């Protein structure tokens, strides 16, 4: 079926269906059966994926029952690492040494989805924090795979679901790194307006209901991309009611949801029960129709340099994403995976929770210090909301219409840089007065200098009402973090 035919079919179904989004509670809402066939969502490259036969697969396997000489694997005699020992936080002076079997395992090719022990630990996270059932529950099967960070996971999703010219629904401002993998693939964006609780349901419903009249040249979307906790760049926290309304709209218009949630454990204002913050439920936790693809990462609360995250979804979509992972990198680094697995296993749930609590307390302190600096140096010059989660303040510079021009022409020459609002906008032709301030990395002494410099430069820039021209062509877009 052609994309235009699908759009017309959905429009016809909506005309024949009266769905009251607000008339029923989420639990009373009549959801359809979970999606059985995902073929209409898949990219052309995944419409006929490369399927290996059992004989071909066995070529790459070696076990006590199979002697395999078909795979291009090096001899264990070549492996350079003979000993490796870790000293982890929250374990005192206790050190963790890798066994010879561990070292042989991680210096050789392994399963594309990741090391089984690490995947099982991550599955326990999803069960503990998102209420997922046993992964093998009949009719509710789900799975996850390890990725070298969510950025690579996004790249896999783009290849799995999008063709050139397809459309993605995004928030009015969103993660700039997402554009690095979508724009080169020719993906179009339709931005939905936001308020203090995230994407506005009525705006989303109106956008999709009037698609053919408002976006006649764009294909009807197949997916929505959202960052629900500590939204990047705004710091917004979607509440449960907002998630439920958006999920019902996704069901109404037959859309999949990409839930990119790097800041899930960085919720800062939630109620504390038994020494732990009660974290908001995710889209994954309310997924009745198998529409959610969830991205998690260890980058924001553990280590960004280890480049490790995981993708969770139903078993049918799991195979599609695993195919793209295998096609691109085979699998994530074995050494990184086992280091993380040993850390998590030796920590256990209690010490993992202690680390999360430690991170939250550090961020609360740094957030408070950032507010003090904003009030001290920039009162009356900026507007901002206090972020409820995540790492960022979304700051509006008063008296200017384009933060990019201000940073390019003035601020950078004073050796101070903030995230550019335009880097988070799906429409790079519209000027924005916003900057993103990463408070997690801010030390108070440096903040004094940076915010004082920002204040002085703003005053001078507005007073002179002119743009200082420079000969060099400078591009300041930062789509990395």
Curated annotation (Swiss-Prot):
EC numbers for this chain: 2.6.1.57
Family label: Belongs to the class-I pyridoxal-phosphate-dependent aminotransferase family.
Enzyme class: transferase
Pfam families, alphabetized: Aminotran_1_2 (PF00155)
A GO cellular-component term linked to this record: cytoplasm
CDD domains xrefs: AAT_like
PTM annotation (N6-(pyridoxal phosphate)lysine): residues: 300
SUPFAM superfamilies linked: PLP-dependent transferases (SSF53383)
Catalytic function, reaction form: an aromatic L-alpha-amino acid + 2-oxoglutarate = an aromatic oxo-acid + L-glutamate
Cofactor(s), by name: pyridoxal 5'-phosphate
Origin species: Dictyostelium discoideum
Compartments it resides in: Cytoplasm
Protein's name in the database: Aromatic amino acid aminotransferase DDB_G0272014
